[in-house]
Amino acid sequence: MGTRREFVAWLSGLSLAGLARPLGADQAVEDKAGAAAQAWLDLVDGGRYGAGWDAAAPAFKSMVTRDEWDQAVHSVREPLGRCLSRTLRSHKLVDALPGGPRGPYVVLQFETDFEQKAGVVETVTPAFGSDDVWRVAGYFIR
């Protein structure tokens, strides 16, 4: 498939491809999705990549094995060092992503400063599951 960085980008489900149809603003939904994204990012920030995979949405898990995820995200995140700060820059509630099942999803874009690189853009896309739980379905870092 190419480099591991491309693989992690692919995992994002093309969430920012501009093909997602907006549903409109629903702050309570976005807040719940944002809390799920933050809890998941806490796992990844702590180097608990396998636990991040365990906590991810089924669609995420169907695209990559736990070991593949661990290797791919390790190769992208470790060189950046520890997360120093993360600021939410945008959020968008959508009902579909290219190639994915119907949503809803919330596409969250953060500006993140790491020890070795500032101004990194992270996109985290939680999906609302059939069990009424928000779980991360996509992660893209550039």
Feature annotation, model-predicted:
Residues 91-142:
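Exposed beta-sheet edge and beta->alpha loop/turn motif
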